């Protein structure tokens, strides 16, 4: 089963709010999820607001989940991918 870390859209028209979730790659964007690992609010007043459970994100990356391009950018800005690479090369 191919697993992806991706965004599911919530919120109203022109006011998006996203959950960062782990889901089967074949399921629809807002369909069945395996686990929610964070949130992303691009419409925040000052800057985009991101909250991610770092332990869950690292667990799913270690288990082989592939982040989408947007989630990859979010994870790299949060420093989670750097931590993942350090853990991977430390072994």
Curated annotation (Swiss-Prot):
GO molecular function terms noted in the UniProt entry: structural constituent of ribosome
Which UniProt keywords are given for this protein, alphabetically ordered?
A: Ribonucleoprotein, Ribosomal protein
Biological process terms in GO annotation:
translation
* Gene Ontology CC: one annotated term: cytoplasm
Which HAMAP family does the record cross-reference, listed alphabetically?
Answer: Ribosomal_bS16
Which PANTHER family does the record associate with it? 30S RIBOSOMAL PROTEIN S16 (PTHR12919), SMALL RIBOSOMAL SUBUNIT PROTEIN BS16M (PTHR12919:SF20)
Similarity section: Belongs to the bacterial ribosomal protein bS16 family.
State the protein's name: Small ribosomal subunit protein bS16
Q: What is the lineage of its organism?
A: Bacteria, Bacillati, Bacillota, Bacilli, Bacillales
